[in-house]
Amino acid sequence: MYETYHSGWIECITGSMFSGKSEELIRRLRRGIYAKQKVVVFKPAIDDRYHKEKVVSHNGNAIEAINISKASEIMTHNLTNVDVIGIDEVQFFDDEIVSIVEKLSADGHRVIVAGLDMDFRGEPFEPMPKLMAVSEQVTKLQAVCAVCGSSSSRTQRLINGKPAKIDDPIILVGANESYEPRCRAHHIVAPSDNNKEEL
């Protein structure tokens, strides 16, 4: 006979901006609350677009959250009786978040992370690829391309209405004033100014 062990697991919600990641995170967390589970939510301090102490979707749905500056702060909280741990905008944390999430799940918690899988250049946005690899469940959501209306898997960064340059900083917190969803065909990354001088 096999022994069974009580262990947690990791759920990963990912996709482009405006694909409903935070909305899906909030939905899953609210289901946990409805089931009388103890739920704790964390979000990075850098994300202050809508509210400092709430995870807020672009549609305005919200859930209370603990604002943290770095991933290690999660472990300073007493999570002994917590059933479900939610972490939004996980791409804003360093790689330490991966080992923390794995420890939390090994300790019996259901851990739900949400964040971008690609940066504005269409390249993997660490640490999300690593989190996807260690997750028991991965949900990849798509938005609607702002240009053609097809499914979008990419996030277009716009600076004054023009595509961002490839050498622009990876992190720029913003919403629809700086970003829009795009399909592969309509996703544009402008060359750096240095490349123009070399041509």
From Swiss-Prot:
Active-site residues from the entry: 89
GO cellular component: cytosol
Binding-site residues, ATP: 15-22, 88-91
Domain of life: Bacteria
Keywords noted in UniProt: ATP-binding, Cytoplasm, DNA synthesis, Kinase, Metal-binding, Nucleotide-binding, Transferase, Zinc
Localization: Cytoplasm
Keyword Nucleotide-binding: yes
Similarity annotation: Belongs to the thymidine kinase family.
Full protein name: Thymidine kinase
Organism: Staphylococcus aureus (strain Mu50 / ATCC 700699)
